[in-house]
Curated annotation (Swiss-Prot):
Organism encoding this protein: Parabacteroides distasonis (strain ATCC 8503 / DSM 20701 / CIP 104284 / JCM 5825 / NCTC 11152)
Keywords: Ribonucleoprotein, Ribosomal protein
Protein name: Large ribosomal subunit protein bL12
Record GO terms (molecular function): mRNA binding; structural constituent of ribosome
Function of the protein: Forms part of the ribosomal stalk which helps the ribosome interact with GTP-bound translation factors. Is thus essential for accurate translation.
GO terms for biological process, alphabetical: translation
Lipoprotein keyword on record: no
Similarity-based family: Belongs to the bacterial ribosomal protein bL12 family.
Record note on quaternary structure: Homodimer. Part of the ribosomal stalk of the 50S ribosomal subunit. Forms a multimeric L10(L12)X complex, where L10 forms an elongated spine to which 2 to 4 L12 dimers bind in a sequential fashion. Binds GTP-bound translation factors.
Residues in the signal sequence: none
Pfam family, one: Ribosomal_L12
Annotated GO CC locations: cytosolic large ribosomal subunit
NCBIfam families: L12
Amino acid sequence: MADLKAFAEQLVNLTVKEVSELATILKEEYGIEPAAAAVAVAGPAAGGAAAAAEEKTSFDVVLKAAGANKLAIVKLVKELTGLGLKEAKDMVDSAPSAIKEGIAKADAEAMKKQLEEAGAEVELK
């Protein structure tokens, strides 16, 4: 048990360069992909690993409907996406459409809140 604790301590104290070298050794000498090793180690250890693995890390903000104040939604979409006015209007007109794709949960929720406050119907996927 003491040997494992010492090994764990050494592992935690590795520098980025040493971790890179370790990954190379594992791949070349043992045929273990570093990502596969992390999944293999973490998988059986945690009972709720399946639920944690399914938790999304990137979200798409989808405009389902512009609502009554379409002009405000077009301006907000233009501001949030950096698109030109025509592109933002076309995006709002073609609802349901993805406003932003693959963004962090906090950013997606903030964007959703802004759009909903302006009167739009928004969904996170």
